[in-house]
Amino acid sequence: MTLRALSTIPSVNRSIVRCTRCPRLRAYCRRVARDKKREFRDWEYWGKPVPGFGDPDARLLVVGLAPAAHGANRTGRMFTGDSSGSWLYEALYRHGFASQPQSLSRDDGLTLNDCYIAAAARCAPPGNKPSRLELDRCRPYLAAELRLLRRVRVVVTLGRVAHENWLKAAGWWERLSPGARPVFAHGTMTQLPDGMIVIASYHPSRQNTNTGKLTRTMWHAVFERVAAVLEHHG
């Protein structure tokens, strides 16, 4: 069955978990799951592609880069078990999109309201850098989610790779001339011809948060803007 034939988010998620399109990434995820990190040696790592997570009727879509090797690749849930997730879920909770401010494991009771989380790549990549070919192979899953998440009005892209891959999955990369495409710069908000609003943000990775490139004030301003836009649109 093709991805286009899938008619529900759960069916897309099952297809993601079974994916074997990228041998390098599958081998890496399995190796990480086998060798583990010392502090997580008692965990049974997920070690498979990570599906999307959240409310299928969401108006907010958050698009990240890829699972972290000892984060979502360990826990099996997007942005769960690492510092990036701590930043994301704390902000989602503060603005009413999450039931709790922490995300530690996929059975911790966390639920999302009016928010769905996806990613450009679904397998943890070595060095946090999926190849262009791997992103191309994975993009149909994001496109399938976009087709089924019919109520989304605002998209937050976390990092340039997520930003550009969302534009490609949504079809805007081809439809818009290079000069008309929404540029990636932290805090920029663009309304597309169909009314969709995309807000770009630096990714809440340690590389950005520990260096001050992304501060808490900058981060929360993104979600304050999201909340304001959704309130305005009803």
Name what the model sees in each region.
Residues M1-L3:
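Polybasic, lysine-enriched low-complexity intrinsically disordered terminal tails
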